[in-house]
């Protein structure tokens, strides 16, 4: 619907309602169409590993939006993008679900869920899903530290990415006494 914006959906598995794909919608300035497609595939495969690890019942998927021709994540018409995403998810008829990822927001998901039910993003909840995701990471770290009798202040942590989730992880680690936290 808008020039300079392409939506790609990758699903790492069969397109079936019994085990639908799930992964967030990412909005970036990819140099090429191939780069966007490859990223979508790589991320969908990674999501399958996450879903298998936690036995969620989902396979991996990812929605990747490529901005080009002068478009950026800040200039994209969000309403039109959410309409396009909703149309694609509706066409896939429950075999792929999405939520927030890089450069998409809860407000975007609120708009998307008005048009399709295939959104997992804490809609209508007081829970900040970014904080909830970060806290699962912190809980895992604390569990491992407890199991192996490790002192967080003696460990070194590298947090990949310092966005909506990573920043909460990094701040929480420091708050828990970690002395060496890198982003």
Can you name each region flagged by the protein language model?
Residues 128-183:
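Glycine-rich phosphate/diphosphate-binding loop of Rossmann-like nucleotide-binding domains
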Residues 1-124:
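N-terminal ligand-binding/catalytic initiation module
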């Amino acid at each position: 619907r808008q020039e300079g914006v392409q939506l790609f959906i990758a699903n790492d598995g069969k397109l079936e309602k019994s085990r639908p794909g799930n992964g967030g919608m990412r909005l970036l300035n990819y140099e090429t169409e191939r780069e966007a497609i490859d990223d979508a595939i790589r991320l969908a495969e990674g999501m399958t590993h996450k879903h298998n690890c936690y036995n969620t019942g989902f396979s991996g998927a990812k929605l990747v939006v490529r901005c080009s021709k002068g478009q950026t994540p800040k200039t994209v018409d969000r309403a039109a993008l959410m309409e396009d995403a909703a149309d694609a998810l509706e066409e896939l008829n429950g075999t792929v679900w999405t939520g927030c990822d890089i450069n998409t927001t809860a407000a975007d998901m609120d708009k998307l869920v008005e048009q399709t039910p295939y959104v997992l993003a804490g809609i209508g909840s007081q829970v900040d899903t970014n904080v909830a995701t970060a806290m699962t990471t912190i809980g895992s770290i604390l569990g491992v530290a407890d199991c192996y009798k490790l002192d967080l202040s003696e460990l070194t942590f590298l947090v990949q990415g310092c966005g909506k989730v990573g920043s909460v992880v990094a701040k929480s680690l420091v708050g828990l006494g970690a002395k060496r936290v890198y982003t």
